[in-house]
């Protein structure tokens, strides 16, 4: 009797193990799957940009030579593809008289940045003010408009490196001396490092 009871108990336990496993691997309504996809940037992501550029004057003839510029900027993504930020640049161009035209543009920027894998293609428009100085004339606030296009490679989650070109329009309007009114058009090409956080 004990043996029969033991065999029946063993069969019941074995049958419960066999029926406990789902052999057809079908999804049930209780199964939960999370779609994980990599996005290079999301709302709230930020980056700091550091740039060294050559500055090429476009409308001064031979009066203004090729110069240089350095730029630092802070940008924050408001969506996966769009960022708002602020850039400060220091630029200079020598003149034919061995003098120096210097300018410090400060711009608010909007950037649209599509990407493919680790390659990023930012398109930026900026508007702001510039402090401009030549000989004994200082001009502030001078309007500045700029457009930028770049190509970057994201080498790590926190760093991207690339090249960027910038077209800059800087007018000078004088109320008292209309004969001094002028504008500058500059094209730049630069090497850029960006730290993402």
Give names to the regions the model predicted.
Residues 169-197:
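Hydrophobic secondary-structure block in the mid-to-C-terminal portion of proteins
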Residues 39-41, 58-63, 95-99, 134-140, ...:
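Outer-membrane beta-barrel domain signature
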Residues 164-166:
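Internal, hydrophobic beta-strand segments that form the core of beta-sheet-rich folds
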Residues 42-44, 64, 100-102, 115-117, ...:
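Solvent-exposed loop and beta-edge segments used for protein-protein assembly and interaction
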Residues 20-78, 83, 134, 188-197:
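Short glycine/proline- and aromatic-enriched beta-strand/turn motifs that initiate or cap beta-hairpins
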Residues 68-145, 153-161, 193-197:
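Gram-negative (and chloroplast) outer-membrane scaffold detector with strong preference
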């Amino acid at each position: 009797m004990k043996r029969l009871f033991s065999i029946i108990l063993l069969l019941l336990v074995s049958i419960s193990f066999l029926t406990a496993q789902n052999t057809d691997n079908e999804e049930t309504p209780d199964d939960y799957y999370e779609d994980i996809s990599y996005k290079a940037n999301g709302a709230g992501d930020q980056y700091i940009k550091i740039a060294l550029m050559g500055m090429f004057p476009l409308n001064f003839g031979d009066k203004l030579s090729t110069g240089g510029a350095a730029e630092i900027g802070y940008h924050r993504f408001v969506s996966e593809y769009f960022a708002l930020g602020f850039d400060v640049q220091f630029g200079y161009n020598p003149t034919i008289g061995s003098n120096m035209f210097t300018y410090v543009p400060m711009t608010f920027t909007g950037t649209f940045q599509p990407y493919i894998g680790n390659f990023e293609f930012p398109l930026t428009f900026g508007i702001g003010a510039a402090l401009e100085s030549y000989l004994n004339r200082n001009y502030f606030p001078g309007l500045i408009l700029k457009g930028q296009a770049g190509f970057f490679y994201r080498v790590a989650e926190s760093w991207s490196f690339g090249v960027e070109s910038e077209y800059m329009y800087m007018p000078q309007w004088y109320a008292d001396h209309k004969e001094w009114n002028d504008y500058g058009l500059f094209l730049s090409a630069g090497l850029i490092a960006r730290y993402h956080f």
